[in-house]
Regions:
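Active-site bordering "gate/hinge" segments
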Residues: 1-176
Length: 176
């Protein structure tokens, strides 16, 4: 499910639950990394993370907040319900409102995002880099600390006033 679909799901669930004012921030990421030692795979890791922080304002304009990693329809409804329950305990001395900048576009330098190459390709590239480094000078006997990783992430903010902001990036890191 992409961030627009999640926003639609939250909006529909909020309407169903009769919640008029809400917002959410989300972070989604996929990370892959490899390490080698003398050409042998030492560590291979892949992870996928998704987290939503949802705020709900009750009819007294008190705010409740909850966090979930369940982005299914039932998970989103449950999170909205929990945030609504939490709003009963909101601070009466503080009134939180949407930022007037929430609908402003995010100015991001456009950079080509890459698709994941995957663990096998990362492992092959790192093995080749280790061999080249070992062969580059006779005094280099081993490369005990090395790694190659790639990360892909998206950050999202949306609210019941129609704001939707999103930022995504991919990056790779090599250390030898």
């Amino acid at each position: 499910m992409n961030s627009r679909e999640i926003t639609t799901q939250i909006s529909k669930a909020a309407d169903f639950l009769n919640l008029k004012k809400w917002d959410y921030g989300a972070s989604f990421s996929n990370d892959y990394s490899v390490q080698v030692d003398k050409g042998e795979a030492k560590q291979l890791k892949a992870s996928q993370k998704q987290i939503l922080t949802i705020r709900v304002w009750n009819q007294s304009n008190l705010v409740g907040i909850t966090t979930t990693s369940d982005i299914s329809e039932s998970g989103i409804k449950k999170a909205l319900k929990q945030a609504n329950i939490a709003s009963d305990f909101g601070n009466k001395n503080e009134s939180t409102e949407f930022s007037p900048l929430a609908k402003d576009p995010i100015k991001v330098k456009e950079v080509k995002k890459r698709n994941p190459v995957g663990i096998k390709k990362l492992l092959t590239v790192l093995r080749e880099a280790e061999v080249k480094l070992l062969e580059s000078h006779e005094s280099i006997k081993s490369v005990p600390y090395n790694g190659l990783s790639e990360s892909f992430f998206e950050r999202v903010y949306a609210n019941s006033d129609g704001a939707f902001r999103s930022y995504s990036k991919s990056q790779a890191v090599l250390y030898l």
